[in-house]
Amino acid sequence: MSSNYVPPDVSRSKAKEIALVNKAIQLANQGDYDEALNIIDQLPPSDNTRQVKAYILVKKYLDLLKDTNTPLKDRINYANQLVAISQRYPNVFSPQDAENIVEYLKEEEKVKELLNKLNDALSQADYNLALQYAKQLNDILNNTQTNNLVKALQIVASVPPPPTPEGTITSFLSQLVDYYKNASQAYSEASKYEPMFRPVADTLSTSAEMLEELLTNVNQILTTHSVSNAEDALKNIENIVNESKSLPIAPITEDILNIAEEMVKQIQIDNEANQYLHSSVKALDEGDYTKAYEDAEKATELLGPNAPQSVKNYTNALAILTKTEPLPSPPSQIKGMQDLLSYFSNVGNALSKNYELTSKASSIYPAFKPIAEAYALHLKDNNHLVDALSKINKKPPKNSDQFAFMSAVLKQISQETAPQNFVTQTYQQIGSQLSTATSESANQYSLLAEANNLIDQANAVITQVNNMMNNANNLSLGEVSQLYKNAADTLEKQALPPMQEAYKILQELAKQGAINQDSVNQVEENIQNIQNTITEFDMLSTAYEYLDQANAVITQVNNMMNNANNLSLGEVSQLYKNAADTLEKQALPPMQEAYKILQELAKQGAINQDSVNQVEENIQNIQNTITEFNLLAVAYGYMNEGYNQLQKLSNVSSPSQGVIIARSAKHYFEQASREFERANVNPNPAKPAIEQATDLILGFDELEKAQNTIAPERKHIAGARPPNPPTNAELAKYYEQLSNAYNTAAEYAYNAEKYFAEAESIAESESETTESENNETTESTANSEGEKQEGEHGARLIRV
């Protein structure tokens, strides 16, 4: 549109208007759209000014569309304005161009939406969802960048989830190392197509290296008995944890650190306890029972519940040995034989008491048995000496011989009054045994820690399954079946194996006497409980699968009945027969199978009886519905036969034939009525048909009477012909009789007409009822009196 166009021969006002229009166009071309629109709006409206305004708005909207800073939502709005203008003024702007702009912007909006969703999925590392959005984006853009993004996401989406904690700590770490190495390779391959995956690949590679180093240090802690080596390994693990805080393995490394700290702490405890036990053995070798007991007690306290039974027995036995008494010292002056006899009697008493104590100690810790035997032997020798001295005391020797004898006895006393001299070898043997027991204790603790870790893994899975079951709401039967199946699989694959592995370890520790059998029995009971739960969940999954199958068939039957409209009686009969067959063959068997399974679970106490009773009630409902449908199939079959008989009435040749056909139809209707009554259908659809057939029978019967009334009289008249013509009197009589017969026949015909009219009225009423009922669906639900409502062609539904 030219900015200097002036039409010829115009008035002054028109010229002014044209000048203003040209000015507005000029302003629009300069980009001052608001001022241009202000000028046009002040002019009188006309086709010319409206087209100029449309031109200005098109220019304005096109400039706004070119501005990428304009929000996309506003740009789409401007494009829609262009479409509206182009449709009204196609000479100003092409409608097709306007539509193309709208389509382009909608595509841009779709791309933006997909990019936002893609970025959200990538930020959450949901690569499967991101792959879906990338494929949709590629379908629109189909450029190298989107093609490469799809390829990269296909690679990373194929990376499986990390392994779940199961088995030993070392086997789990080995699995993690392999996983992160493989994942790093996959992300490295993906980064060839999309560079954003390179940092992820590097992170995964670093994680794999740290996990490998972590595994090395954990193995060092598990295999060493050196405190310094274990502490060095722990320090390395702490460094790994600090370095991995920004990595995805941070939670795992922290958990491993906690376990490693406990293991090293136990190694330190075992080492300190071992030092106390060595000190105890040394004190025992020196005959210092009190010192030996104190050190052994400190070792036992350090080991706590993990202390080997042999160390506990050793400590308890030493507690008894501390009660032994030193033998009395020899008298400094011996005045006579009585002094010696008194001394050795006191020695015997001390030996006897010590023998009792050492015997008791050896019953607790058999390694102390040689000490008790030594005291027994020494007591025996001392008793012999006391007997000898008693005899000498009764008949003392001469003074010189007496002193010589006492001198020999004192020499013997000086050699035999220190019991430790003849049990030193026994003490050394005890020390060796205790050192071995301490080494075994460290090993046993590692095994116990591993068993506890396995049990924690199993318990974590069990908690996960419990949460999954508790949070499952509003599920379909099929979803419930899958829920139980998933729960059983999870328990069988992730909870049962670590619990069984822990059981093997604890069983071995119990054989070594490191733990009591109760702990083993408890884990064995847990295994049995898990196995029972798996069996119950599998059974429940199967039961709900059967219920889902039955419910699907019932839904299918309900849909079939819902969609059954405008059917003939024969089709209604076949519909009920097919529905009954389907329920009997496809819904009832799986429901019965589910009932058997649930009944067995109820006997075991796994579920309550209410669930079983509900399924049993459902089975009864299905069986009742099958019986009812079979009755209705037969009933509508009879109804169909009855109406087929009535159809024959249009071709009857005599009233008597009509009576026969109507009676046959009534017979079928009566049989149908009995079946409807057995099916508890109220109102009975056969009742009107019976009434209709009855009226037809009565009508044809009246017609037959009319025919039989006229026929004889007409025969008389027909027979009054030459050669025996009737007299006038006879002929008058015949016609009078015929007239009377016609009058009687007319009454019969009137009655017949009345019966046929009633039959027709019933037929019309039933036709209207049937048409109304064919537009409805009657559900098989009991009313308050327990009767079921049924239209003539109404499809009966079931609900289980």
From Swiss-Prot:
Any one annotated GO CC term: virion component
Organism: Acidianus two-tailed virus (ATV)
Protein keywords: Coiled coil, Virion
Keyword Coiled coil: yes
UniProt-annotated location(s): Virion
Predominant subcellular localization, coarse grouping: virion
Chain coiled-coil ranges: 98-130, 447-475, 514-567, 606-633
Region (Disordered): 759-800
Acidic residues bias (residue ranges): 761-776
Name of the featured protein: Structural protein ORF800
Basic and acidic residues compositional bias, start-end: 785-800
Tree of life domain: Viruses
